[in-house]
């Protein structure tokens, strides 16, 4: 199997086709608020299974030479379509899980629960990245000419199997969710008001919502797109061996496994959610400024800076996501989270393209040993600028919290 760079770019971009341009993520949020977590969660699981199954079929099947689908080679078009469907399921599953956590932990250890959920998700991502190549290699074959061919569909089949197990697990969860609803009724809890379409207007006219959404897109735009270029930065600026260059950026997601639940627990018990977001934004600015300045271009300094970024990357999400239910009523949470994710996806699509353009147009260095070098100073200042903007909105959010009494500085645990 051979896929050109252009085809691979089309395939990877497919994740956002339906979510961003067809507004499926927002529609999913509305369905979540109207139909509930059980219906929406099962639907999201089935979409993920369908999408992954389509990808597996596309990658494992040999199609007629010259056949096309959606204006692309059939294999690429079918795989991209599967990835787009999978992306809808993933994003809707994400907002569904967030609403489930609020349902179970509101007034309790909500930030800790969200932190543990984020840590578990990142652990899954790390494992997926770690086992893909070994599995493809293990199930590979050597042809008659002695050329080894890795089994590319094998990791996809494993993922499809894991998704099926996850779907069964969520189906089992639905029974526990029914029990929770029954126990709340027995305790005399007031039934939640039904979601109405006019609630969308109430969300988008809520200043606190937009402050959180803009803080989210600016902060994540300075982290995830940076990680796409971080390995090359380690090579170009800090002279790290290319085979080891990915080790330093990998410290960031590894650190969040432990720090995000830790800071979430702090928010639950002590409060200071807006302050945590401000501190995280300040650390983000500091880190990208250090990466931009021509000082201490050695590997150990880059490692220290990356660890500090990991702290900032844990501080903001641990406080930001649990703060949304303090600003938005629970009946509107699915739509609110969907809108935030939708805004975030625009940033995560646009910023990598911006950085790539800046590198190619303004940051090219000499060609060394046949390889193009780049000066990452300007991109790092751009990332620092996103951090400054995130800090501005974090400070604004803290001021708005004082006016509106959202309770962002108060503990989540109600005594």
Which sequence ranges carry the predicted segments?
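C-terminal ends and interior cores of transmembrane alpha-helices
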Residues: 46-71, 282-296
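Extracytoplasmic gate region of multi-pass secondary transporters
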Residues: 206-260, 351-352
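Symmetry-related core transmembrane helices of the 12-TM Major Facilitator Superfamily/SLC fold
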Residues: 153-173, 378-396
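Juxtamembrane intracellular "pre-TM" segments in multi-pass secondary transporters
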Residues: 179-212, 413-415
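Cytoplasmic helix-loop-helix junction between adjacent transmembrane helices
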Residues: 76, 82-120
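Glycine-rich segments within core transmembrane alpha-helices of 12-TM secondary carriers
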Residues: 111-137, 341-352
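Helix-to-loop junctions at the C-terminal end of transmembrane segments
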Residues: 22-37, 259-272, 359
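C-terminal transmembrane helical hairpin of 12-TM major facilitator-type secondary transporters
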Residues: 273-320
């Amino acid at each position: 199997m051979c896929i050109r760079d252009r085809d691979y770019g089309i395939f990877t971009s497919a994740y956002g086709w339906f979510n961003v341009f067809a507004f499926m993520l927002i529609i999913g949020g509305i369905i979540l608020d109207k139909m509930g977590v059980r219906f929406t969660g099962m639907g999201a699981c089935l979409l993920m299974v369908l999408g992954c199954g389509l990808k597996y079929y596309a990658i494992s099947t040999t199609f007629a030479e010259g056949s096309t689908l959606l204006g692309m080679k059939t294999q690429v078009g079918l795989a991209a379509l599967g990835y787009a469907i999978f992306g809808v399921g993933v994003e809707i599953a994400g907002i569904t899980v967030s609403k489930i956590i609020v349902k179970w932990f509101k007034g309790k250890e909500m930030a800790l629960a969200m932190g543990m959920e984020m840590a578990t998700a990142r652990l899954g991502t790390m494992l997926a990245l770690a086992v893909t190549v070994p599995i493809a290699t293990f199930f590979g074959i050597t042809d008659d000419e002695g050329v080894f061919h890795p089994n590319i569909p094998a990791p996809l089949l494993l993922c499809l199997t894991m998704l099926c197990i996850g779907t069964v697990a969520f189906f089992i969860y639905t029974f526990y969710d029914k029990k929770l609803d029954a126990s709340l009724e027995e305790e005399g809890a007031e039934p939640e008001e039904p979601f109405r379409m006019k609630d969308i207007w109430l969300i988008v006219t809520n200043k606190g919502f937009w402050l959180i959404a803009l803080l989210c897109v600016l902060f994540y735009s300075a982290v995830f797109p940076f990680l796409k270029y971080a390995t090359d930065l380690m090579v170009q600026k800090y002279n790290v061996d290319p085979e080891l260059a990915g080790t330093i950026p990998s410290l960031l997601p590894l650190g969040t496994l432990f720090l995000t639940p830790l800071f979430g627990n702090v928010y639950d018990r002590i409060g200071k959610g807006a302050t945590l977001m401000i501190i995280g934004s300040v650390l983000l600015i500091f880190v990208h400024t250090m990466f931009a300045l021509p000082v201490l271009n050695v590997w150990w300094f880059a490692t220290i800076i990356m660890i500090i970024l990991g702290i900032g990357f844990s501080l903001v999400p641990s406080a930001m996501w649990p703060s949304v239910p303090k600003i938005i009523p629970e009946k509107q949470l699915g739509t609110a989270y969907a809108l935030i994710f939708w805004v975030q996806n625009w940033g995560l699509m646009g910023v990598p393209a911006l950085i790539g353009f800046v590198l190619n147009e303004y940051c090219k260095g000499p060609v060394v040993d046949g390889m193009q070098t780049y000066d990452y100073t300007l991109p790092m200042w751009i990332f620092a600028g996103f951090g400054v903007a995130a800090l501005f909105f974090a400070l604004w959010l803290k001021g708005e919290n004082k006016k509106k009494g959202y309770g962002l500085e108060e503990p989540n645990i109600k005594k």
